[in-house]
Amino acid sequence: ALTEQASKVALTADL
């Protein structure tokens, strides 16, 4: 769950 969320946040914050 943590890895999934971290990946999502990384993509969302990918500037």
Curated annotation (Swiss-Prot):
Any Gene Ontology biological process: reductive pentose-phosphate cycle
Cofactor(s) required for function per UniProt: Mg(2+)
Coiled coil, from the record: none
Superkingdom of origin: Eukaryota
Localization in the cell: Plastid, Chloroplast
Keywords, in A-Z order: ATP-binding, Calvin cycle, Chloroplast, Kinase, Nucleotide-binding, Plastid, Transferase
Pathway stated in the Swiss-Prot or TrEMBL entry: Carbohydrate biosynthesis; Calvin cycle
Enzyme class: transferase
Main location class: plastid
Keyword Coiled coil listed: no
GO molecular function, a single term: phosphoglycerate kinase activity
GO annotation, cellular component aspect: chloroplast
Keyword Nucleotide-binding on entry: yes
EC number(s) on file: 2.7.2.3
Catalysis: reaction(s): (2R)-3-phosphoglycerate + ATP = (2R)-3-phospho-glyceroyl phosphate + ADP
Assembly: Monomer.
Family: Belongs to the phosphoglycerate kinase family.
Protein name in the entry: Phosphoglycerate kinase, chloroplastic
Species name: Physcomitrium patens (Spreading-leaved earth moss)
